[in-house]
Amino acid sequence: MIKKELPDEFGHFGPYGGMFVADTLVSALKQLEHAYTKYRNDQDFLSELHTELKDYVGRPNPLYHAVHLSKKIGGAQIYLKREDLNHTGAHKINNTIGQALLAKRMGKTRVIAETGAGQHGVATATVAAKFGFQCVVYMGSEDIKRQSSNVYRMKLLGAEVVPVTSGSKTLKDALNEALRDWVSHVDDTFYIIGTVAGPHPYPQMVRDFQAIIGVEARAQHMEKTGRLPDALVACVGGGSNAIGLFYPFLNDQSVMIYGVEAGGKGIETGEHSASLIAGKPGVLHGNRTYLLCDEYGQVKDTHSVSAGLDYPGVGPEHAYLKDTGRVIYKAINDSEALDAFRLLTHTEGIIPALESSHAVAYAIQLAKTMSKEQSIIVNLSGRGDKDMHTVAAIDGITI
């Protein structure tokens, strides 16, 4: 049985989580924790958040029965939670709206963020434009190449995009640079972390803002079918879209829960981003969790066709859910994700993000082992517009 009161007062999910940061950041994190504790149950704050999610983000978004996909596969009925229909095209805005409202109440004038696929950067730049914050987004130079359209969107929204050329030039390096910035500008700056990783209180706070996904999906599935789903499936990079769907179902033992990591070119090749499946516990970006690292504890380079899953760690709550066995973690490789990307597009007229395609791919495998009376909710965490250049290049087409 999952204890719903996690994390504890120190930000621990069992042996994971915590606040492993330089002394210079402790007071900023404590200030943030105090503000979040104050406002998370404040009716004015929650009312404003609800209004923004409804009128600006476009919630609730639908739970869509993918009839044609389900029929083609045979087996369980697949339902898609349509986070791709949110303003900005992914689940990321659920969290950035929440953190922006908190930053406003804390009197901050500047927001910073890290981004991989660019979706969190776009969602942060969007709320910065809306609420009048100065905005700086750190992005690995490798990801800037892969996600040029999102880079332009951020600049259009008024954000400064800073290329990060250290390390593997991807998400983990962008996170390092953002943390360095925050240390230097703690008085006026709010760091909007995009996933359920990082030091306490971020894993809890981001989970709480993303839990709207599961709250809605649960009610929508009950309304459509009169019962709970048999399984949930979501992709896991840092893990915020997944924990958002999973959290409201954790105590429902009849619901099987699957997190899907990026298997890249195959786990056996070492070129992947599956930290829960192939990693071991360690400390990265302020929290203890599962990491991909070598025998000397150095963080390994990761690979995925999807920039948003290309991260060597994972949120600490996922590490805890793996160890307790409540969530089962699987890997889907690049080619399987691309096949699912094409199949969903062809059968339903919905172009998913490559991240979400990993979840769709595993749901397809799972559905085949289940009966037609059973159902699976897949978190369609984002739309695939941002991935057109990547998929076209794989197909040998230049656009």
Curated annotation (Swiss-Prot):
The modification N6-(pyridoxal phosphate)lysine is found at K92. Transmembrane segments: none annotated. Pathway: Amino-acid biosynthesis; L-tryptophan biosynthesis; L-tryptophan from chorismate: step 5/5. Pfam families: PALP. It comes from the Bacteria. Keywords: Amino-acid biosynthesis, Aromatic amino acid biosynthesis, Lyase, Pyridoxal phosphate, Tryptophan biosynthesis. Disulfide bonds: none annotated. One of its GO terms (cellular component) is cytoplasm. Its EC number is 4.2.1.20. InterPro entries: Trp_synth_b_CS, Trp_synth_beta, Trp_synth_beta/beta-like, TrpB-like_PALP, TrpB-like_PALP_sf. Its cofactor is pyridoxal 5'-phosphate. It catalyses: (1S,2R)-1-C-(indol-3-yl)glycerol 3-phosphate + L-serine = D-glyceraldehyde 3-phosphate + L-tryptophan + H2O. PROSITE patterns: TRP_SYNTHASE_BETA. GO terms for molecular function: tryptophan synthase activity. It is an enzyme of class 4 (lyase). Tetramer of two alpha and two beta chains. Belongs to the TrpB family. The beta subunit is responsible for the synthesis of L-tryptophan from indole and L-serine. HAMAP family: Trp_synth_beta. NCBIfam families: trpB (TIGR00263). This is Tryptophan synthase beta chain. It comes from Legionella pneumophila (strain Corby).
